[in-house]
């Protein structure tokens, strides 16, 4: 199924007679895929939380609110108003960077869920789809290549620095951050897609 959807990305770019329709098709696939990942992230986080004691949930949530995610190093809109003012290319570039930041951490999600739900391959396919959208929306700008998005801040290897004795906290934060970032990407891609319809109301 993943290969079929990715093929649709490629075939859609090859049709030049209806550029708006093609872009909408590309965006529809990308939005659908990130919605699936967001729902999956929510389910995994909820399942993990339900396995904890109430006091554990409270303490972990308190720590998480004071901590940060790996992706916080990536410059992104601070609120819905800035999101709506951002260009399509900027939203696509940030979305790519957010998905890319999970290439390594996604392999360590709780309970072997990454392998069971094929999360890493799904992220990789979404990255390739977003890359195609970036190329299609550059309009003569420098081509996007080698997985590098300009004007985005670097990020650290935060998840690699946690010790084994912090495995519970690590699992909680990984799932919470994964859920948060998939929500961000879903929002950015949805707004970017909406921009292709001049008469649409893209208010968040």
Curated annotation (Swiss-Prot):
GO molecular function, one term: metal ion binding
Cysteine disulfide partners in this protein: 69-177, 194-202
Residues reported in the UniProt entry to bind Zn(2+): 36, 186
Chief localization: secreted
Keywords: Disulfide bond, Hormone, Metal-binding, Pyrrolidone carboxylic acid, Secreted, Signal, Zinc
One of the Pfam families matching this protein, by short name: Hormone_1
Keyword Oxidoreductase in annotation: no
Compartments in which it is found: Secreted
Position of the signal peptide: 1-17
CC annotations in GO: extracellular space
Single GO BP term: positive regulation of receptor signaling pathway via JAK-STAT
Residue list for modification Pyrrolidone carboxylic acid: 18
Family the UniProt entry places it in: Belongs to the somatotropin/prolactin family.
Protein role: Growth hormone plays an important role in growth control and is involved in the regulation of several anabolic processes. Implicated as an osmoregulatory substance important for seawater adaptation.
Name of the molecule in the record: Somatotropin
């Amino acid at each position: 199924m993943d290969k079929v959807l990715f093929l649709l990305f490629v075939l859609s770019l090859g049709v030049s007679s209806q550029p708006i329709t093609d872009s909408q098709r590309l965006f529809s696939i990308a939005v659908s895929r990130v919605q699936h990942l967001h729902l999956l992230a929510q389910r995994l986080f909820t399942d993990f939380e339900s396995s904890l004691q109430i006091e554990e949930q409270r303490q972990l949530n308190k720590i998480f609110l004071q901590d940060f995610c790996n992706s916080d190093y990536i410059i992104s809109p601070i609120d819905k108003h800035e999101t709506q003012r951002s260009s399509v290319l900027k939203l696509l570039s940030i979305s790519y960077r957010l998905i890319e930041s999970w290439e390594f951490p996604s392999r360590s999600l709780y309970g072997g869920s990454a392998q069971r739900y094929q999360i890493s391959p799904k992220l990789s396919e979404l990255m390739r789809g977003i890359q195609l959208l970036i190329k299609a929306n550059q309009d003569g700008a420098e081509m996007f290549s080698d997985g590098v998005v300009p004007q985005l801040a670097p990020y650290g290897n935060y998840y690699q620095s946690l010790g084994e004795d912090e495995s519970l906290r690590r699992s909680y934060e990984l799932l919470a951050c994964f859920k948060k970032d998939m929500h961000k990407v879903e929002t950015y891609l949805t707004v970017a897609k909406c921009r292709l319809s001049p008469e649409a109301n893209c208010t968040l």
